[in-house]
Amino acid sequence: MSFNHKTIEELHDLLVAKEISATELTQKTLEDIKSREEAVGSFITVSEEAALRQAAAIDAKGIDADNLMSGIPLAVKDNISTKGILTTAASKMLYNYEPIFDATSVANAYAKDMIVIGKTNMDEFAMGGSTETSYFKKTKNAWDHTKVPGGSSGGSATAVASGQVRLSLGSDTGGSIRQPAAFNGVVGLKPTYGTVSRYGLIAFGSSLDQIGPFAPTVKENAQLLNVIASSDVKDATSAPVRIADYTSKIGRDIKGMKIALPKEYLGEGIDPEIKETVLAAAKQFEALGATVEEVSLPHSKYGVAVYYIIASSEASSNLQRFDGIRYGFRADDAKNLDEIYVNTRSQGFGDEVKRRIMLGTFSLSSGYYDAYFKKAGQVRTLIIQDFDKVFADYDLILGPTTPTVAFGLDTLNHDPVAMYLADLLTIPVNLAGLPGISIPAGFVDGLPVGLQLIGPKYAEETIYQAAAAFEAVTDYHKQQPIIFGGDK
């Protein structure tokens, strides 16, 4: 019997009643991972021995009835540091890197007696939208194994969608939680910038990166955010705001809530069937008592261009630390220090990572800084101001998460511009540091469609309230891919 169909609260009740032990739950989770892994390829590392040791220790001291997460397995994206467990960022450059410390988000999970079951596959250094740039493998969509799972947190999304684990962590720099959540029909949240500590997250774009949760349902997603959100002196960008319970508004009605629907989010480049799905969702919100009105975010069309200048510039700086000297891959054909640097970085980084390093270095170079990086920062401010104007009158913004459903494997990985445009609807949220969630909202050609809800800073509770209200009157989150299996 698999437990992958049980909610976290149901699993907690079983653990407290001693109908199952943490060890049994961990063993069953490991079985679920193994039985599905060949089909989807969610994991880079499965930490079986460490997980079973931790489960045994939890059983020895007993499940804490007041701690919902006690004994619950957790999958962690492979750019989030885990002490004693390989953390590769899906790169040859870090193929053998074993951190000597835990990321704060992981430490918070351990403090709640969660069990890290393994590290999930991703695009190399989180640069990509399909989980095809990983050095190790290509992850496949849980619903259709000929399609991509999205990225960069593709493995974290498919691990939940395929029933391998109930909960996972990802990171989101330009849509890397929300896009794979949409493509796989699960719930993925990018919190407000600074809500979850970035300490221990392998940096890509430091002004954009944010760790966040994946789960099958809105409430479980909020329950995991309760665990990982915290202020942290180890992260200078950590926010002092801390909500006591992100589930506090779940179950409340949304009568009187004002929701904005940007016309730009339903314009050029958006699949007509995606547009129909979003408009149907808007009607559902109106039926629940909310007001939905069209607004404009005029500068959102510049988001992709702004993002790829800023994110690549930050990446070119952040990735300078990977040089083969102290840890990770080192080229064995180098004869002097210069060759160590050049050969290691040439051989250790994949094509997409090198492309972004070069783009960022160019944008920061003398003579081009003002025209590119400085200008991008100025347009970023205009995008932020657009959001501020809307949130002066509205509680939330509604739109599609992605312009299309999941695309085929090997169809866009040789066309970087087309791949970049897949993040058209998620990128502005990162540029503005806002919270955004993707929830299941329908299907097109048998593939899930994600609905995105965006709030002002620190409005995660309101986002969860609206998302849960929609979830309560729809059944999209209950539909599972064939691979999920298990008792229903």
UniProtKB/Swiss-Prot annotation:
Name the GO cellular-component terms.
glutamyl-tRNA(Gln) amidotransferase complex
The UniProt entry, under InterPro entries, shows: Amidase, Amidase_CS, Amidase_dom, AS_sf, GatA
Q: Which SUPFAM superfamilies match?
A: Amidase signature (AS) enzymes
Q: What class of enzyme is it?
A: ligase
- Domain of life, per the record? Bacteria
Q: Name one Pfam family in it.
A: Amidase
Catalytic activity annotated for this protein? L-glutamyl-tRNA(Gln) + L-glutamine + ATP + H2O = L-glutaminyl-tRNA(Gln) + L-glutamate + ADP + phosphate + H(+)
GO BP annotations listed: translation
Query: Where along the chain is the active site annotated?
Result: 77, 152, 176
What UniProt keywords apply to this chain's record, in alphabetical order? ATP-binding, Ligase, Nucleotide-binding, Protein biosynthesis
PROSITE patterns recorded: AMIDASES (PS00571)
Keyword Transmembrane applies: no
UniProt key word Ligase: yes
> What molecular functions are annotated in GO for this chain?
ATP binding; glutaminyl-tRNA synthase (glutamine-hydrolyzing) activity
Q: What is its EC number?
A: 6.3.5.7
Role? Allows the formation of correctly charged Gln-tRNA(Gln) through the transamidation of misacylated Glu-tRNA(Gln) in organisms which lack glutaminyl-tRNA synthetase. The reaction takes place in the presence of glutamine and ATP through an activated gamma-phospho-Glu-tRNA(Gln).
Please state which protein family the record places this protein in. Answer: Belongs to the amidase family. GatA subfamily.
Per UniProt, subunit arrangement is:
Heterotrimer of A, B and C subunits.
Q: What is this protein called?
A: Glutamyl-tRNA(Gln) amidotransferase subunit A
